[in-house]
Curated annotation (Swiss-Prot):
It comes from Kluyveromyces lactis (strain ATCC 8585 / CBS 2359 / DSM 70799 / NBRC 1267 / NRRL Y-1140 / WM37). Residues 1-29, 128-156, 650-830 are annotated as: Disordered. The keyword Ribosomal protein does not apply. This is Eisosome protein 1. Required for normal formation of eisosomes, large cytoplasmic protein assemblies that localize to specialized domains on plasma membrane and mark the site of endocytosis.
């Protein structure tokens, strides 16, 4: 008996007005709704919306008719285990139960507080959302009750062991229901040794299987024992005056359809939400009904509950004498041990009879098995005799077969020896003839070797004289070829030196630009700190202004001081605006310098690619020299030189003389300043132009696809040039050579208005376009609207790009080309 049931049992009222018997209280009054709900939560029983079970009938007069209907509809067969408790119900119940806390040992004086805490542990999560005032009142009551214990004659209760045992039994019962134990129903005696002997000697025969009862026979015997015919006659007599409409509910069909629908959707969200809603509504109604007598918020009510609990304990102890030496079977039933023994004997007697019957059958089966084992032993001995006789006969047959086999082998060996002797004499005569022929061939071979040695001596003398003459002529030709090739390499070396100088100058400029950027950033930080100081002064002035405006109504004499403060505030605000303007201008300058630095980097990358191209060409010319030396040629192959350079060696020297002034202008440091204009690169095969567009700042670099990583493009171009140079070194196919004879000028670079995924370089594109005839096309770039580089700009301007036509060479003459003009305007609006 719990403390909650003892307290609330006296004040609970029945809705029907009549008292009902209950197993929870000795007085016969039912528990409160809150106590019943908490007991259900504690033992895992949760009301599911899919199951609407009614306890009894609405009208007591119809109880007999309902019992008759249930008796006729009751199935007499024993069905398999069915889990009536919904698994989702236990999950929902666990979701609202608070986690169990470990209770420390408490003194006997704090019985009331321990009972309250144990009931609070089993409460749902909805009970935790109560106000802090409730918790404070509970704490004060616990302290007061523990400090001033109640004095009574009866000893104090300690129901911790009772609660622990109840919880343990409830957990075991729930575990048995959710995970039922699988019982192995074995026929025969349950003794282990006897069972092992039966397993070793028992065999199912057709007679035993035919004598086993079937499922149908079990069902028939169960129906005979249930007296179904008698119950049916009583049910027919009871149904004469039965009207099903009076018993059944009007909304029964709708509720049955709703129940079926919910059973189908047990795992859906709607069922869970409805279950949560029902639980919350139930908790709300309980809170509303018991608000005036809440257990944990009313100290006086708790004291009264403790006194009532002690009185009930005294009554139960006084009434314990009536049930002494008796066993409680539940439902208020107490029986003596003798009665229980008589009932047990009546129940166990049929079981013992069945055991005797089965043991008799088992003994008969053992006798049958013993007879069969004797027959089996006799048959086995007969089989062994037959096998021994068979083995003796087999040994005699094997001895005779062995003697016959030896005779046959001796005859065969004699015939084979005669044949072998005849064969040896025949082969010896053939070997003698072959030896005579071998001696004749050896004499012929010696004579042939002498003749060949004389011829080799004459050939060696002739070859030495020819090699000496050929070596002298090759040395003279090699000296002449080296002189010619050094003359060809002079312009390449000049271009390489100029490009390296230009590269070093660009690196110096890059360092200066980075220093300027760092200085400007430092100044920006200083201005920002100054702006913050001015903001602080403005705040102080504003506070002072507010205080002075309040004092203006009281003191008219401070009007002039207030005016001076306002003027100083305006001056500080003007200084702040000035500093902000300086910061914005310096930030714009920093961004423009970053743009110049990016342009400078692109120009350095462009010069690096040009240097690599020229070095690769020098390597290829050296390789062509080595090829000419190996082939003993005076000059380099003009066809390959034309395929590589675009012109012959003579035309190339003439064009290099015209290119020298342009290379000097390129090496001028005044022309190498970072600007947004295009850079003109003089190639080795003519004037090849490449536009280097102004790069956007770092935070807008993703909007332009024309400037990607130069290292990847550089590696790719180097691989392409190496592959094409190897192709030039080993020569071309005849079809390719015919096409390359028409190509006298490399294809000019085309500038596409769309952003390219590769960096813009001024490399010679004849390696990739050997089989394509040159086409001179002029592409016009339309002005595109690009974002400005300032964070304070109010708009964007057009970047106008004008590109002239690429240079074309016709008939070995070179036409002058116009310079590329690319201007990037950065408009700053403050």
């Amino acid at each position: 008996m719990s403390l909650v049931s003892a307290v609330t049992g006296d004040e609970s009222r029945d809705t029907n007005g009549a008292e009902q018997s209950s197993v929870y209280q000795s007085a016969g009054k039912p528990l409160s709704k809150e106590a019943l709900y908490r007991a259900k939560l504690k033992y895992g029983v949760f009301q599911s919306p899919a199951q609407s079970l009614k306890a009894g009938v609405v009208n007591g007069k119809d109880a007999s008719d309902t019992a008759a209907n249930l008796a006729t509809s009751n199935k007499t067969t024993i069905e398999a285990y069915k889990r009536l408790l919904n698994p989702n119900a236990s999950k929902a119940a666990n979701a609202v139960i608070t986690p169990k806390k470990t209770d420390q040992s408490r003194p006997a004086s704090a019985v009331v507080s321990s009972a309250a805490s144990s009931a609070a542990i089993a409460a749902p999560k909805a009970a935790r959302s109560r106000t802090s005032s409730t918790a404070s009142t509970t704490v004060t009551y616990v302290n007061s009750s523990s400090s001033s214990p109640l004095h009574s004659k009866t000893p104090k209760m300690d129901i911790t062991k009772v609660l622990a045992g109840a919880e343990r039994n409830a957990a075991e019962s729930v575990h048995q229901r959710t995970n039922p134990e699988k019982v192995s129903y074995v026929r025969g005696i349950t003794d282990r040794s006897v069972g092992k002997a039966a397993d070793a000697s028992f065999s199912l025969t057709s007679d035993i299987v035919s004598n086993l009862p079937t499922k149908k026979e079990y069902i028939q015997s169960a129906e005979k024992e249930s007296h179904a015919a008698e119950w049916a006659q009583k049910a027919v007599a009871a149904l004469k005056d039965f009207n099903p409409d009076d018993v059944t509910d009007k909304n029964w069909r709708e509720r049955e359809e709703e129940r079926k629908r919910l059973i189908k959707n047990l795992t859906s969200e709607t069922v869970l939400t409805k279950a949560k809603l029902n639980a919350q509504q139930r908790l709300d109604t309980i809170d509303r009904e018991t608000s005036q007598r809440a257990i944990f918020r009313n100290a006086e009510y708790n004291r009264a509950a403790a006194s009532v609990a002690q009185e009930n304990l005294r009554k139960t102890r006084s009434s314990a004498s009536a049930t002494a030496n008796k066993v409680n079977l539940g439902g208020g039933l107490w029986l003596a041990p003798d009665d229980i023994d008589n009932i047990a004997k009546g129940l166990i007697a049929p079981v013992l009879d069945e055991v005797d019957q089965r043991t008799g059958a088992q003994r008969a089966m053992d006798i049958d098995i013993q007879k069969r084992s004797v027959d089996y032993q006799q048959q086995y001995e007969e089989w062994v005799n037959i096998q021994t006789e068979k083995q003796n006969n087999d040994s005699l047959l094997q001895a005779k077969a062995f003697e016959n086999h030896q005779k046959e082998t001796a005859d065969i060996e004699a015939t084979l020896a005669k044949k072998f002797q005849n064969l040896c004499t025949q082969k010896d005569s053939e070997v003698a003839k072959l030896k005579e022929a071998l001696e004749a061939k050896k004499a012929e071979l010696a004579k042939l070797k002498e003749d060949n040695e004389e011829e080799l001596k004459r050939e060696d003398e002739m070859i030495t004289t020819e090699c000496a003459d050929l070596q002298k002529s090759n040395e003279n030709e090699l000296e002449q070829a080296k002189k010619d090739q050094e003359e060809l390499l002079v312009p390449f070396k000049n271009d390489l030196a100029a490009a390296e100088d230009h590269h070093t100058e660009l690196q110096d400029q890059k360092g200066k630009i980075e220093e300027n950027i760092q200085e400007l950033r430092d100044s920006i930080e200083k201005h920002k700190s100054h702006v913050e100081e001015l903001n602080a002064q403005i705040e102080t002035q504003q506070q002072q202004l507010e205080t002075e405006t309040e004092a203006l109504n009281l003191q008219s004499e401070s009007h002039q001081q207030l005016k001076d403060g306002i003027e100083t505030n305006y001056v500080i605000m003007a200084e702040k605006a000035k500093e902000e303007a300086k910061v914005s201008s310096e930030e714009a300058r920093v961004k423009q310098l970053e743009v110049d630095a990016i342009i400078n980097e692109r120009q350095t990358e462009l010069s690096n690619t040009e240097i690599e191209v020229k070095r690769e060409k020098l390597k290829l010319i050296d390789a062509m020299k080595e090829v000419a030396e190996v082939k003993n040629e005076d000059k380099i192959d003009e066809e390959k030189a034309k395929a590589f350079l675009g012109t012959t060696s003579g035309e190339f020297l003439a064009s290099q003389k015209k290119v020298e002034p342009a290379t000097k202008l390129q090496s001028d440091p005044k022309l190498s300043e970072p600007s947004s204009k295009s850079t003109k690169i003089e190639g080795v095969t003519g004037n090849v132009k490449a536009d280097v567009p102004a790069s956007p700042p770092a935070h807008k670099k993703h909007s332009i696809g024309g400037l990607t990583s130069p290292l990847k493009s550089k590696k790719k171009s180097d691989k392409d040039q190496k592959g094409s140079s190897i192709k030039k070194f080993f020569g071309l196919k005849p079809s390719d050579q015919n096409k390359n004879t028409k190509t006298t000028q490399p294809t000019p670079l085309k500038s596409s208005p769309k952003p390219s995924n590769k960096p813009v370089t001024a490399t010679v594109t004849t390696e990739k376009k050997e089989n394509v005839e040159p086409k001179s096309t002029a592409t016009e770039t339309k002005p595109s609207l690009e974002p400005s580089f300032s964070g304070f700009s109010q708009g964007s301007v057009h970047n106008k790009v004008e590109q002239s036509d690429a240079s074309e060479v016709e008939g070995g003459k070179e036409e002058p080309t116009s310079k590329d003009n690319r201007k990037s305007l950065f408009k700053e609006v403050f």
